[in-house]
From Swiss-Prot:
Localisation: Cytoplasm
Gene Ontology CC: cytoplasm
Name of this chain's protein: Uridine kinase
GO process terms (BP): CTP salvage; UMP salvage
């Protein structure tokens, strides 16, 4: 097995980056592709009271354990198995369990700040930024956090205005300049997804 092809997929919250990642993932046999979500690498906060965890800024680069993420990506590149963390969004903390991830021909790395850290960028073979209008993104975030993460409408809106939007403008949007490909319209852009799949297949054949 040769070195895996690493694909970084980023974009603002609710941009459709997870949809793009899943669309690409589903185009390949499960035996040859793996998914690494940056959300799984939020720092362990076991020593922090729950009330404090609720107030933390989770859209800032410091919220992520990039040291562990980079170590895991390098291990996958070296064809080693890793134990990927599992993050509990309701408890705002890592679970004790992990998920075993085996090295595959294709590794997708997906998250809001995947292109922000130069150490992560240099490991990626393809860098994708999913670009979607802000009003669409906030509606998607609202629906997701209420339905999947046990949040209230007021808490989601307050977090968006005080944290999510400022962090998007400061860290996520500027990382667009590092992308090899910018995909508009999120996961609904079938042409872009099909082009990416063709490009990945070409890289695998080289």
């Amino acid at each position: 097995m040769k070195r895996p092809v690493l694909i970084g997929i980023t974009g603002g919250t609710g941009s459709g980056k997870s949809t793009v990642a899943k669309e690409i993932y589903n185009k390949f046999d499960e035996a040859c592709i793996a998914m690494i979500e940056q959300d799984s690498y939020y720092k362990d906060q076991s020593s922090m009271p729950f009330e404090e965890r609720c107030k933390k800024n989770y859209d800032h680069p410091d919220a992520f354990d990039n040291e562990l993420l980079i170590d895991h990506l390098k291990n996958l590149i070296d064809l080693n198995v890793i134990e990927k963390p599992i993050y509990d969004f309701e408890a705002h903390n890592r679970k004790e369990e992990t998920i075993k991830v085996k090295p595959r021909d294709i590794i997708i790395v997906e998250g809001i700040l995947v292109l922000q850290d130069p150490r992560v960028r240099e490991l990626l073979d393809i860098k994708i930024y999913v670009d979607t209008d802000a009003d669409v993104r906030i509606i998607r975030r609202l629906l997701r956090d209420i339905n999947e993460r046990g949040r209230t409408v007021d808490s989601v809106i307050n977090q968006y205005l005080t944290v999510v939007r400022p962090m998007h403008m400061q860290f996520i949007e500027p990382s667009k300049r590092y992308a090899d490909i910018i995909i508009p319209e999120g996961g609904h852009n079938r042409v872009a997804v099909d082009m990416m799949v063709a490009n990945i297949k070409h890289l695998l054949q080289e």
